[in-house]
């Protein structure tokens, strides 16, 4: 027979639980508000010291709490403040999406990382003109260890880009700028970052899926994960694009110092395609970072494979370097996964801290050519690390 409980003691226990719970909730709210204040102060301090014209910052905490910040100016001359929802080019950080689609295809058994690229593209009439074409593997092009030169900084490419600002580029036209060039190094025997790698990868992905890459990205990633502020940067007029600052007629791109001009970007950004190819917000990129590096986009086996880095110098396996569309950095406090990106007028750095389960992305509306960006975005992220440690270290 169950012993009857004392009603007074039960009421006291319930009161105690509710009281402690309310204290904990109040503490969490207080800590969160303090955290937000410190982050905003740090961002404002960098802007006031002239590190960048304007910036947005997106943070997703371990429990999924989303925070969005902004500082400085969307347009300096017109005194238009930056807002958290301001959209900017992701630059090469867009490669993380391309790599994710590739890893989903690996999981489905439709793509083999260690197969030679020739098995997918060898029948193409132009294929034999690619440097190292006989030895390239899928893994090599995804880790930038295949030695393919970069097309994007070639003088003849940037000249044609400016001469034909509305041109829609076919992937093979982009590759043609490196046809018959000497490789950066022997296949698998070095590391050299190259957007050309991801143009080749994009062609392969379209061949496997039978659809254009952006449709596949929408179906597999953007729609399922509700990344509503991320879309292709494949036209000169892009909704929500904030003003960006680049070098005024500075090589290699020779664009106006302030872009877009009357709402129209000076050249068609479509050329970037699978080398980046997206416009987004810092919060969407922070969301994506958390989704990707916490294994929600594909299986743990594929994620483990993605996160195996190749040394930035030797191109051989190391404890930090470049994985399959991801940069892996080893720091005293732990690892960082992520990717940087630049497109004329804009820079992006997405970072995920597995130790704390926190994703951080910063975007600024200036690039290194502009003279208005002082320091690296990795450095800006580094300034936030002590704040993250203060609030989230266990």
Feature roles, as predicted:
Residues 339, 348-370:
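Short, well-ordered beta-strand elements
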Residues 368-394:
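Short, gly/Ser/Thr-rich active-site loops of penicillin-recognizing serine hydrolases
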């Amino acid at each position: 027979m169950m012993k009857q409980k004392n009603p007074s003691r039960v009421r006291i226990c319930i009161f105690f639980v509710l009281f402690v719970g309310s204290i904990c909730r109040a503490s969490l709210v207080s800590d969160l508000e303090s955290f937000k204040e410190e982050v905003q102060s740090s961002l404002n301090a960098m802007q006031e010291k002239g590190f960048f014209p304007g910036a947005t910052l997106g943070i997703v905490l371990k429990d999924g709490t989303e925070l969005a910040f902004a500082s400085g100016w969307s347009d300096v001359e017109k005194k238009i403040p930056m807002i958290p929802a301001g959209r900017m080019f992701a630059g090469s950080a867009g490669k993380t999406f391309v790599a994710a689609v590739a890893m989903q295809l690996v999981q489905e058994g439709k793509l083999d990382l260690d197969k030679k690229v020739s098995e997918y593209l060898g029948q193409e009439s132009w294929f034999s003109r690619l440097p190292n074409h006989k030895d390239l593997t899928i893994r090599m092009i995804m880790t930038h260890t295949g030695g393919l030169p970069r097309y994007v900084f070639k003088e003849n490419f940037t000249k044609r880009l400016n001469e034909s600002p509305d041109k829609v580029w076919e992937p093979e036209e982009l590759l043609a700028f490196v046809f018959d060039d000497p490789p950066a190094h022997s296949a698998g025997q070095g590391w050299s970052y190259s957007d050309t790698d991801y143009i080749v990868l994009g062609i392969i992905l379209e061949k496997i899926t039978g659809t254009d890459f952006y449709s596949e990205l929408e179906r597999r990633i953007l729609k399922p994960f509700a990344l509503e502020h991320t879309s292709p940067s494949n036209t000169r007029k892009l909704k929500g694009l904030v003003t960006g600052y680049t070098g005024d007629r500075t090589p290699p791109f020779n664009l106006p110092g302030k872009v877009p001009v009357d709402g129209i970007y000076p050249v068609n950004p479509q050329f970037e395609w699978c080398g980046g190819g997206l416009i987004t917000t810092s919060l969407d990129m922070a969301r994506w970072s958390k989704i990707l590096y916490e294994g929600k986009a594909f299986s743990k086996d594929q994620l483990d494979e993605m996160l195996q880095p190749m040394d930035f110098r030797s191109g051989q396996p190391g404890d930090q370097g470049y994985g399959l569309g991801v940069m892996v950095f080893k720091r005293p406090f732990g690892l960082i996964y992520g990717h940087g990106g630049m497109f004329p007028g804009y820079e992006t750095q997405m970072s995920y801290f597995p130790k704390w389960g926190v994703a951080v992305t910063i975007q600024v509306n200036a690039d290194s050519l502009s003279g208005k960006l002082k320091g690296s975005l990795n450095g800006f992220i580094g300034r936030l690390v002590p704040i993250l440690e203060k609030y989230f270290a266990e």
